[in-house]
Amino acid sequence: MGIKGLSQVIADNAPSAIKVNEMKAFFGRTVAIDASMCLYQFLIAVRQDGSQLQSEDGETTSHLMGMLNRTVRMFENGVKPVYVFDGKPPDMKGGELEKRSERRAEAEKALTEAKEKGDVKEAEKFERRLVKVTKQQNDEAKRLLGLMGIPVVEAPCEAEAQCAHLVKAGKVFGTVTEDMDALTFGSTVLLRHFLAPVAKKIPIKEFNLSLALEEMKLSVEEFIDLCILLGCDYCGTIRGVGPKKAVELIRQHKNIETILENIDQNKYPPPEDWPYKRARELFLNPEVTKPEEVELTWKEADVEGVIQFLCGEKNFNEERIRNALAKLKTSRKSGTQGRIDSFFGNSTKVTCVTAATKRKAEEAEKAKKGAKKGGPPKKRAK
C-alpha cells in the first residue's frame, strides 16, 4: 500500500517538489529499483490478446521478458539500475498482510462471479488483483540479472527501506518504486512510473523529499508522523482524520502525542493500543544492510548463459534475445562515452517541468479555449 494519499498531499501542499520528466533526463544516474514492485508490474501487464507470456510448459515468463526489456531500455537512456529484493516482512506488517489475504479472498469470489456472468473485463480486473510474485519468479529474476551483469541487493527486510538508505548514502540517485513510503524511509528522491511501458507514454514523476519538507515546513519526524496519520502498512490510523485534517493537525501540534492530547477522541477515535511509536521507529531506523557494506558492480553480460536460460529453458526466441543483448552491450559502451561527453559540456540539454508548472499551463490553455468560444472562463469553485 505504501502511504495512503501521500502523492496527492505533496501535489496539493508542495507542488514544486514534483517534477515530470522523461527517462533520458536521468542520463548518467544510478537508480535503486524496488524489484518486487517491478516484477508485479510485469506480471499484471497482459498482451493484446489478454494473455500473459508463457513458456511451452505453460509457465508464466512475463516477468523475465519485462526485466530484460526494461533493463535494456534503462541502459539505452544512460541509466544504471540496481535491483533490490525484499527480505522478510517486519512483524508490524502482519496486520496489513492479513488484510491483503482477505482482499484476495474477496477478489477470488468476485472473479468467479464475473466468469459466470461472462464479463471478460471484470474477470481481467480481478485476475490482476490476484497476481502475486512467487519465490520462483523472484529467484528467476535474480538469476537473469546475474547473467546480465546487473547488481542485485537482497534486503534483510523492506526493499524500499534499503533503497532509501542507498540513496541517503549517495550510492544511487533515487528510488524507483510506486510505493510512496520510500520517502518516509528517507529516500531523498522517489521516481514513479519509471518502468511504465513506452506505448502508454506515462511521464516519470520525480518526488524530492527535501523540497517537500521545505515547502510544507515540516521536519523529518513531523513528516513521518503525517505519513502514519495518512495510513501506512504498519498500523491503523485515527478514524475520521483525512488527508487535509492530518496536515492541519501535524502543522498545529507537531507530533501524534500532542495531537492525541488535544483532539476530541470521541469524534476522532484512535485505534486501541495504537502502536504508532513502533511504526515511527521502524521508519526512522529500519532493518537494512549498511550502505558501505553493499558492493555495486556492473559486469559484462554472459550472453551464452542468458541464451541457455531464456531460450533453452524458457523457450524465448533466440534472435530476439540476442538482439536485446546486443543493444545492452552497445548502450553500455555509448553510455560510458556519453558520460565523458557530459563532463566536457557536450551533453544534450533535457528540459523538465514541475507538476505545478504543467498544471498552470493546462489551466491557461483551457482559459484560452474558453475565451475563443465567446465568454470568460468560469471560476473554479473553492
Curated annotation (Swiss-Prot):
Residues 359-368 have a biased composition (Basic and acidic residues). Mg(2+) 2 binds at D179, D181, D233. One of its GO terms (biological process) is DNA repair. Residues 1-104 are annotated as: N-domain. Residues 122-253 are annotated as: I-domain. Its cofactor is Mg(2+). Residues 336-344 are annotated as: Interaction with PCNA. Phosphorylated. Phosphorylation upon DNA damage induces relocalization to the nuclear plasma. Binds 2 magnesium ions per subunit. They probably participate in the reaction catalyzed by the enzyme. May bind an additional third magnesium ion after substrate binding. Residues 358-382 are annotated as: Disordered. GO terms for molecular function: 5'-3' exonuclease activity; 5'-flap endonuclease activity; DNA binding; flap endonuclease activity; magnesium ion binding; manganese ion binding; RNA-DNA hybrid ribonuclease activity. It holds the Pfam family XPG_I. InterPro entries: 5-3_exonuclease_C_sf (IPR036279), Flap_endonuc (IPR023426), HhH2 (IPR008918), PIN-like_dom_sf (IPR029060), XPG-I_dom (IPR006086), XPG/Rad2 (IPR006084), XPG_CS (IPR019974), XPG_DNA_repair_N (IPR006085). It is an enzyme of class 3 (hydrolase). GO terms for cellular component: mitochondrion; nucleolus; nucleoplasm; nucleus. Residues 369-382 have a biased composition (Basic residues). Mg(2+) 1 binds at D34, D86, E158, E160. It is found in: Nucleus, Nucleolus; Nucleus, Nucleoplasm; Mitochondrion. The keyword Lipoprotein does not apply. DNA binds at R47, R70, E158, G231, D233. Its EC number is 3.1.-.-. Structure-specific nuclease with 5'-flap endonuclease and 5'-3' exonuclease activities involved in DNA replication and repair. During DNA replication, cleaves the 5'-overhanging flap structure that is generated by displacement synthesis when DNA polymerase encounters the 5'-end of a downstream Okazaki fragment. It enters the flap from the 5'-end and then tracks to cleave the flap base, leaving a nick for ligation. Also involved in the long patch base excision repair (LP-BER) pathway, by cleaving within the apurinic/apyrimidinic (AP) site-terminated flap. Belongs to the XPG/RAD2 endonuclease family. FEN1 subfamily. Interacts with PCNA. Three molecules of crn-1 bind to one PCNA trimer with each molecule binding to one PCNA monomer. PCNA stimulates the nuclease activity without altering cleavage specificity. Interacts with cps-6. This is Flap endonuclease 1. The gene is crn-1.
